[in-house]
């Protein structure tokens, strides 16, 4: 059974994604819990760097906030690389991930083994992420099981 989801944007656009619960079980579960509890509702992408990433998930919108709990990195044995569309967990240092995540615009091999890739957005979602501006808002994020 696959874990899939949607990020609904204030613009009306929808970013579709799939999670990698086998390769990054704790990170995927943390994201699913936050998404389905409404944590990401009305939260912005506060850091958008063209050609690099669109980062969101901080309820303060400053880049300094989180969910109040941290999770360990799941980079060891994780075969997923930071390619266009990768969903990856942001952190302030090893094992400090919380709620902030980013969508990769173009391959970023220097992030491999440093940040946990826990999902992948589809091609249309990559284009939405590439077109984002700082402050673009998610209205709802949800994760579901798909057979």
Positions of PLM-derived features:
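Cyclophilin-like peptidyl-prolyl cis-trans isomerases
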Residues: 1-147
